[in-house]
Amino acid sequence: MPPHQHPDVVKRLKRADGHLQTIIEMIEQGRPYVQLAQQLEAVERAIENAKKALIHDYIEQCLDRAGTAPGPRGRAALRELKAVAKYL
């Protein structure tokens, strides 16, 4: 799979997008705040899990490059790894 294709992450985000549309409808219908808060929490978790999956994949790619590319390319891969780690 090319480095920027993440079908599982896209699927998760599309599901979260659909969930958000449902929450908007719930708000417009005047549904109870507790239900809205629960659903918003679920969307937050879904987005967080998508982010983690994306970052974990990227970390794996960086580690592969760092291990197979000595010298400047390996060091560059480690710098990229450190840069993305702050989003975990």
Model regions and ranges:
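Solvent-exposed interaction patches of small proteins and small membrane subunits
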Residues: 1-88
